[in-house]
A protein has these predicted regions:
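Active-site microenvironment for binding and transforming phosphate-containing groups
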Residues: 1-204
Length: 204
């Protein structure tokens, strides 16, 4: 019969779907991502891909690992039990990351500015300059505008997934009749309370 399973914390960050199952998550700017093997269509792995899921912040700022995996994407890949030679056929994607122009990690921010700088430098060095908006400009890079979509794309590509098989959907810019955003983000005008309900289904 039908059943609902509620997950919280780290156990909710990834889930393997079978045909006919649906994954639901409420988000406020964090993207969701997925990995799919067309040769094994009876499973789809879905993950929550907020920044803290994509990098080990404690390792970056304090030099101490806080978990086994660098990123939730690495954990998803292992869960799929795929060989490196199989990566070229894999389909992967993400949806609804916060606009990087709103996702600011300023280097001069009181108390956390130095750590913001370390995080941005780590991301640029390990995943490419395109993960930080205007990284090549010494002044604008200090705004620390992290592009989660490009960070996810870079991590997928590092696994050997073909660029043409990586799909991304940006956060909608839709507004209501009064000009207010219809897509909630925690750093937007609606504040931290509203959320968006995202559903992912693997059809039979």
């Amino acid at each position: 019969g039908k059943r609902v399973v509620l997950l919280r914390g780290a156990s909710a960050d990834i889930i393997m779907l079978a045909p006919g199952e649906t994954f639901a998550i409420s988000v406020g700017g964090c993207p969701i991502g997925w990995i799919f093997d067309p040769q094994k269509p009876n499973r789809l792995i879905v993950g929550h891909m907020g920044l803290q899921c994509l990098i080990d912040r404690q390792l970056i700022v304090a030099g101490q690992k806080s978990r086994k995996y660098r990123s939730v994407i690495d954990r998803m890949w292992e869960s799929m039990n795929l060989l490196p030679m199989e990566a070229s056929r894999i389909q992967a994607g993400y949806a609804f990351p916060i606009d990087p122009l709103h996702y600011v990690h300023q280097w001069d921010y009181p108390d956390s500015g130095d750590n913001n700088k370390r995080v941005c430098e780590y991301i640029a060095a390990n995943f490419g300059n395109k993960c930080i908006v205007d990284w090549n400009n010494p002044e604008t890079r200090k705004l620390g505008r992290i592009h989660l979509g490009n960070l996810i794309r870079s991590q997928y590509a590092s696994l050997g997934i073909s660029v043409e098989n990586i799909h991304g959907v940006s956060t909608p810019n839709a507004v209501d009749v009064d000009g207010h955003p219809l897509w909630y983000v925690t750093r937007g005008p609606h504040g931290k309370d509203p959320r968006n309900l995202v559903l992912v289904t693997l059809y039979q």
